[in-house]
Amino acid sequence: MTMAAGPSSQEPEGLLIVKLEEDCAWSHEVPPPEPEPSPEASHLRFRRFRFQDAPGPREALSRLQELCRGWLRPEMRTKEQILELLVLEQFLTILPQEIQSRVQELRPESGEEAVTLVERMQKELGKLRQQVTNQGRGAEVLLEEPLPLETAGESPSFKLEPMETERSPGPRLQELLDPSPQRDSQAVKERALSAPWLSLFPPEGNVEDKDMTGTQLPESLEDMAMYISQEWDHQDPSKRALSRYMVQDSYENSGTLESSIPSQEVSSTHVEQGEKLWDSSVQTCKEGMNPRNPVPGVEKFENQERNVESVSPESTHPPVLLPGQARREVPWSPEQGRLDDREGHWECPPEDKIEESLVGTPSCKGLVQAKEQPKKLHLCALCGKNFSNNSNLIRHQRIHAAEKLCMDVECGEVFGGHPHFLSLHRTHIGEEAHKCLECGKCFSQNTHLTRHQRTHTGEKPFQCNACGKSFSCNSNLNRHQRTHTGEKPYKCPECGEIFAHSSNLLRHQRIHTGERPYRCSECGKSFSRSSHLVIHERTHEKERLDPFPECGQGMNDSAPFLTNHRVEKKLFECSTCGKSFRQGMHLTRHQRTHTGEKPYKCILCGENFSHRSNLIRHQRIHTGEKPYTCHECGDSFSHSSNRIRHLRTHTGERPYKCSECGESFSRSSRLTSHQRTHTG
């Protein structure tokens, strides 16, 4: 024994070392891996992450990337699925507050699933406004939605005898309504604890004063509502979400339990009561209002109450209480009323909110819709006409103002306050309000007078930026600038020819229509252009004044005729060479031959021209445009003179005749060549 103890005592450290190695081996065992967080957990951490949770910005960004990848799972999902998650999150964010939290607790996985849940909850909230009270046993029990299936399976059964209705209940509701003698009232309480809609009602009284246990059923509906609300708040969120989902799922198939409540006695009693039904309904609507703050809608109910006696018993309906009237006649949601802190009463909302809250009430709905005409509070002091808003009244009063200013006494026509109508009114009464002090000419508008006065002052405030030329009117400047830009905004719809000015287009269209609006009063001959008419009228004037009585000298056909014989020379004379012209524009064009001015420049090649027509003819070289088409053979030409020369080949016209031998030619150049044969 001693020898065995010797070595054991001599090697205590070895034993310790063996024990340490054994402990070390235990410590080196790989710990079990932590479970990977779910996508929802990563999503919540991603949204709740704060900058202060990380030691630095780089770590914060890295943590956010990690949480985002844990939420979206790009290695498992496609781009479309990730986009669906982002859209789903934004959709859940913009939902109304009353259903947002409920949908988020159900955690829909796709947008379609979220839309389905929202639609079901909207139907649920709509049905809550159509609750019916069950007065069969003396206590008003509000039954709105079917109960969850889990509670029905775990608790004893209870028996309900469904009343015959037009629609049959769904399979889940039929299972609950299956007659079984083993169900008691305890199952009713257990099912009621999971109904989500009961938590929407505002609790009343002090919950702490009520000492109730899970086995004690409240005696009144008020105690039941407070007890259910308290238990619902302490319930597990997962069970609460599951209960809501089951309620919504069965709600769509079954409708509401109000159609399955044994209410034959109640309905028969209501039919026997007759007129009293409507009286109670109207009284119920009145009691929902605060007498301290009367609203305009009260008169609607009072007026309808007087006409109740004419309603037949067949058209009556069971009395319906508003949600919350079973609990001291209090509105059930903040949208229908708010609590007055001073006296502890719920104030009645405005009239429009009351009408919205009465949508599900058949008896009150007809009363509300009886008088829905908009009120007209804006009265015209002149004619007494009434309007619903102030803007319509102001628009109407402008008619009276226009009648005062613009009533035409002679023709009885009324014009508005627009300057165009005022000027039109002046033409009716012959008024010329604006008179020129220089020549005495009158104008109906001040702008016309200002434009006319520039002819006396010579003012030309509108200057061309390209060539520096000035004009008295802005319209003339715009017309002039087209010579530089080459713009031709006016196009003939018949042949497609384009023009720089609208007047040229109108003149051209007369070729297609054959219109000749200018007619000579002497002989009745018509012309397509006013200039042609002026030239023609000079022939009649020359016949009356030829020969002149003062000098006895006649005028040949080639000399221009002067309507004013006081000046026997042309009105516009060139100061350089003495040549005279009948029009100022011809003199201006002639003076460019002396000055060498070429204001018209080609924007493509830079070549300058003294006349605009030469520039237009030149630009067709660059564009290749041939706007003049022969109607006989379809050939096109860049110049009108070429088309005229070409048309003579079809018509055989020879306008150029030799005075020596009488031979005719189609071109002037050929006549000139022929005349050289006579002169040698």
Swiss-Prot record:
InterPro entries: KRAB (IPR001909), KRAB_dom_sf (IPR036051), SCAN_dom (IPR003309), SCAN_sf (IPR038269), Znf_C2H2_sf (IPR036236), Znf_C2H2_type (IPR013087)
SUPFAM superfamilies assigned to the protein according to its UniProt record, in alphabetical order: beta-beta-alpha zinc fingers, KRAB domain (Kruppel-associated box), Retrovirus capsid dimerization domain-like
Subcellular location: Nucleus
Positions of the SCAN box domain: 43-125
First-listed, main subcellular location of the protein, grouped into a coarse class: nucleus
Positions of post-translational Phosphoserine modification: 168, 180
Keywords: DNA-binding, Isopeptide bond, Metal-binding, Nucleus, Phosphoprotein, Repeat, Transcription, Transcription regulation, Ubl conjugation, Zinc, Zinc-finger
Gene Ontology MF: a single term: zinc ion binding
Signal peptide start and end residues: none
Any GO BP: negative regulation of transcription by RNA polymerase II
Positions bearing the Glycyl lysine isopeptide (Lys-Gly) (interchain with G-Cter in SUMO2) cross-link: 19, 159, 286, 300, 376, 570, 579
Pfam family, one: zf-C2H2
Zinc finger (C2H2-type) residue numbers: 378-400, 434-456, 462-484, 490-512, 518-540, 572-594, 600-622, 628-650, 656-678
Tissue specificity: Expressed in Purkinje cells in the brain (at protein level).
One Gene Ontology cellular component annotation held by this UniProt entry: nucleus
Function: Transcription factor that binds to the consensus sequence 5'-TCCTCCC-3' and acts as a transcriptional repressor. Binds to the promoter region of SIX3 and recruits other proteins involved in chromatin modification and transcriptional corepression, resulting in methylation of the promoter and transcriptional repression. Acts as a transcriptional repressor of HS3ST1 and HS3ST3A1 via binding to gene promoter regions.
Subunit field text: Interacts with a number of proteins involved in chromatin modification and transcriptional corepression including DNMT1, DNMT3A, HDAC2, PHF8, TRIM28/KAP1, SETDB1, EZH2, UHRF1, CBX3/HP1-gamma, and CBX5/HP1-alpha; recruits these proteins to the SIX3 promoter region, leading to SIX3 transcriptional repression. Interacts with MAPK3/ERK1 and MAPK1/ERK2.
Family according to the record: Belongs to the krueppel C2H2-type zinc-finger protein family.
Protein name (Swiss-Prot/TrEMBL): Zinc finger protein 263
Origin organism lineage: Eukaryota, Metazoa, Chordata, Craniata, Vertebrata
